[in-house]
Amino acid sequence: MAIILGIDPGSRITGYGVIRQVGRQLTYLGSGCIRTKVDDLPSRLKLIYAGVTEIITQFQPDYFAIEQVFMAKNADSALKLGQARGVAIVAAVNRELPVFEYAARQVKQTVVGIGSAEKSQVQHMVRTLLKLPANPQADAADALAIAITHCHVSQNAMQMSESRLNLARGRLR
């Protein structure tokens, strides 16, 4: 069993999603958004750090998964996004959580089956995969999709390791 916290970083809205994985079964534990309504960036970063720290304290995750930085339309946006990611990662590292990063395209490919999927498609598949009564908010859905991606990637890696070990022992041909 593992609890995974997924984070969709943003300097104004940071989405989070928490799921439990038992074997191949995924269970929804919680999701939402950290909204920073102040104007100055240092205060927003402080709120993101405090919010992520509070979520970690509440859910006690085993793994922390976050979206990688993509090339934003302007440099200022990319820098702010990078700083928001940074404080979220620091919150995880301060709690000694292993941090995993996934590209947005990989997340969409894993959850929807198309790397260029629309937000509405991600929301629908997250709802379906986690058996939710309604589509989660867009940023929370992205965070849940990041957590789901971590489950799939780590499960595939574990299966590959077991196969290699069995091959080395002469059990597979």
Curated annotation (Swiss-Prot):
Active site residues per record: D8, E67, D139
Cofactors that this protein relies on: Mg(2+)
Gene3D superfamilies noted in UniProt: Ribonuclease H-like superfamily/Ribonuclease H
The EC number(s) this enzyme carries: 3.1.21.10
GO BP terms in the entry: DNA recombination; DNA repair
Annotated residues for binding of Mg(2+) 1: D8, D139
Catalytic activity: Endonucleolytic cleavage at a junction such as a reciprocal single-stranded crossover between two homologous DNA duplexes (Holliday junction)
Pfam families xref list: RuvC
Keywords linked to the UniProt accession: Cytoplasm, DNA damage, DNA recombination, DNA repair, DNA-binding, Endonuclease, Hydrolase, Magnesium, Metal-binding, Nuclease
Family annotation (SUPFAM superfamilies): Ribonuclease H-like
A GO term for molecular function: crossover junction DNA endonuclease activity
Cited InterPro entries: RNaseH-like_sf, RNaseH_sf, X-over_junc_endoDNase_Mg_BS, X-over_junc_endoDNase_RuvC
Residues where Mg(2+) 2 binds: E67
Co-factor note (free text): Binds 2 Mg(2+) ion per subunit.
Signal peptide: none
CDD domains according to UniProt: RuvC
GO-annotated cellular components: cytoplasm; Holliday junction resolvase complex
Localization, UniProt: Cytoplasm
Its biological purpose: The RuvA-RuvB-RuvC complex processes Holliday junction (HJ) DNA during genetic recombination and DNA repair. Endonuclease that resolves HJ intermediates. Cleaves cruciform DNA by making single-stranded nicks across the HJ at symmetrical positions within the homologous arms, yielding a 5'-phosphate and a 3'-hydroxyl group; requires a central core of homology in the junction. The consensus cleavage sequence is 5'-(A/T)TT(C/G)-3'. Cleavage occurs on the 3'-side of the TT dinucleotide at the point of strand exchange.
Subunit structure: Homodimer which binds Holliday junction (HJ) DNA. The HJ becomes 2-fold symmetrical on binding to RuvC with unstacked arms; it has a different conformation from HJ DNA in complex with RuvA. In the full resolvosome a probable DNA-RuvA(4)-RuvB(12)-RuvC(2) complex forms which resolves the HJ.
Protein family (similarity comment): Belongs to the RuvC family.
PANTHER family: CROSSOVER JUNCTION ENDODEOXYRIBONUCLEASE RUVC
The protein's name in its UniProt record: Crossover junction endodeoxyribonuclease RuvC
Naturally occurring in which organism (per UniProt): Salmonella arizonae (strain ATCC BAA-731 / CDC346-86 / RSK2980)
